[in-house]
Amino acid sequence: MGCNMCVVQKPEEQYKVMLQVNGKELSKLSQEQTLQALRSSKEPLVIQVLRRSPRLRGDSSCHDLQLVDSGTQTDITFEHIMALGKLRPPTPPMVILEPPPISHEYYDPAEFMEGGPQEADRLDELEYEEVELYKSSHRDKLGLMVCYRTDDEEDLGIYVGEVNPNSIAAKDGRIREGDRIIQINGVDVQNREEAVAILSQEENTNISLLVARPESQLAKRWKDSDRDDFLDDFGSENEGELRARKLKSPPAQQPGNEEEKGAPDAGPGLSNSQELDSGVGRTDESTRNEESSEHDLLGDEPPSSTNTPGSLRKFGLQGDALQSRDFHFSMDSLLAEGAGLGGGDVPGLTDEEYERYRELLEIKCHLENGNQLGLLFPRASGGNSALDVNRNESLGHEMAMLEEELRHLEFKCRNILRAQKMQQLRERCMKAWLLEEESLYDLAASEPKKHELSDISELPEKSDKDSTSAYNTGESCRSTPLLVEPLPESPLRRAMAGNSNLNRTPPGPAVATPAKAAPPPGSPAKFRSLSRDPEAGRRQHAEERGRRNPKTGLTLERVGPESSPYLSRRHRGQGQEGEHYHSCVQLAPTRGLEELGHGPLSLAGGPRVGGVAAAATEAPRMEWKVKVRSDGTRYVAKRPVRDRLLKARALKIREERSGMTTDDDAVSEMKMGRYWSKEERKQHLIRAREQRKRREFMMQSRLECLREQQNGDSKPELNIIALSHRKTMKKRNKKILDNWITIQEMLAHGARSADGKRVYNPLLSVTTV
């Protein structure tokens, strides 16, 4: 219910006392009884509240009862209309005065709600806003609690006291506490009876409220110069039409009859979202160039009330309506108004859809104002309008159709703009990479050959020829070489095409090998290994340049992750030389062997321009590291900077796998595998280390057990066996003699007594020699 008048929460609210609820006296009841009465009361709730005024009057004869407020819950359904007349409480006699002028007088609700002093400069600082609330059925509730005055003061207006958080009005977000309701569905309301009668009508599913509030400070940002600059940029044809319509309309009806297709500056509740969403209405240089930022290019537009077609109908009104009007166009208003652009300037949106969008916005604004279609702008009232309006149809049905079509066009326009921004971001990144490659190549060509350790080959630690891993992640990066080609525009391609081959070749004299056949057209570019033939390399480079787009300078093919400038620097020209693992001890002799092999008389010694250029190119982004093999030996390797490598690698993997589905993965010959992050790889290493320790412990325990069995003394075991055998024989011998004794037993063993305790001497004594 949202009533908090019976519980004192703030010190300044201690003077509030609830008098009646639906005609029942509550002033003498306790707090628990008051709560019980509120819970048991039926809707609609009519609450009469008494408060003390902080401003005492000299001619007042009553000291305690100064002001009386009465509030009515407005979420009234059709079933409660009949009960409303019966439950209406007796109110004090009201003094009927003339309604105050709408355009120049305003009573701040904070005066009588909180007792603040009245300001003299508040008369002209008013802001009007028309809010439309849509209900799916007449049983839905708006969720507004209105308050009105019942004392002898001149203020007879109706104010919004509270907004239910989960109601229709709260979801709309434009109605705030303290707003004064001027009109309901175009009808001026002066007292509670009129408001309740209009709000409780059954056929009203769409309710239009004209509210007034003090002008927000954000509305003063725009000056006349800003408005003139805005009109110069986007055309002022609609400005003249709006001025002509404003001069024809009476002053009292201006708030209800004027519409803009852009959303002007609203109150503080919507200022933040409008600042984030709208990038068109601001004319300063910093915001005009805002599209160059990465955040704007990503197209993250937060949802706000200005994105919906129903929120395009906001307006602010001050003392001089012509001079103080503020225009604030959002992204929707750019497409709606035209803004000096044609339909062809928006990619993906045809001219017909563009014109249709503008016409729908104009028709919607006129229908919401209650005007006829004959009063539309000339371009909307002509024969181009495809909307057939039947005067007999309901206004709500027509508005629903317009809303649906507008939402469809807005959704399409937003997707087009977001895709365009993402394309611009990709183009900028690719251009930056290409420029970086060119600059590094020029720098490498001008430097002398002065790097003594530049020929240390960066090769995998383990060479598993049987490995078929298609992805260089985790342990597989040490088992398979990378087959890559550099960027088509990169100058490294010319040197690498003639002097390097990523397929490993044993050291020895150069052997003439036939050039590899060209790959089939359907094979992807990332599986084409670099050819050793210079002519083939030049032809392939020319073909790559021919496939480039002349406008943007970008390749039409999808660039794989290996063609990233960061990954392409890992591969240098190796020519015919073999693979060497260098340790700190063997570094000098190995270097001498390499120089001897690349001498002028060596068969394997060829031009090494590509290797030098590549080494100089990757120098700023490489670092020397001492690696440790599994057997404990150490070697020096040149590795790229890890953060750049991992960042580029993760970005390319994400781009490649974004459009990959299960069916594509099953059909494709290359299995993408799974990409493990850095933390996951650390966990894998820890888990593998623990398993290895566990296996070593088990093997050591088994070896110790076997060693003890082999080296142990066998005598105790034999003694135990002999003793057991002897004990078994004794038991068997005892069971041989029983009461049934044969002659042979008598002769051999003697006789046993009846009790079995004594054995007599045998008759025969046999001695075996």
Curated annotation (Swiss-Prot):
Domain of life, source organism: Eukaryota
Pfam families membership: PDZ
Coiled coil location: 389-419
GO cellular component, one term: cell cortex
Residue ranges of domain PDZ in the record: 130-214
Bias (Acidic residues): 229-239
PROSITE patterns registered for this protein in UniProt: PDZ (PS50106)
Comp. bias regions, Basic and acidic residues: 282-298, 447-467, 530-547
Region (Disordered): 221-315, 445-579
Subcellular locations according to the entry: Cytoplasm, Cell cortex
Modified residues (Phosphoserine): S236, S454
Listed SUPFAM superfamilies: PDZ domain-like (SSF50156)
Mutation effect (R39C): In a breast cancer sample; somatic mutation
Principal subcellular localization: cytoplasm
Lipid metabolism among keywords: no
Bias kind Polar residues: ranges: 468-479
Name under which the protein is recorded: PDZ domain-containing protein 4
PANTHER family, per database record: PDZ DOMAIN CONTAINING RING FINGER PROTEIN 3, 4, PDZ DOMAIN-CONTAINING PROTEIN 4
Keyword terms of this UniProt record: Coiled coil, Cytoplasm, Phosphoprotein
Tissue-by-tissue expression: Brain-specific. Expressed in fetal and adult brain. Up-regulated in synovial carcinomas.
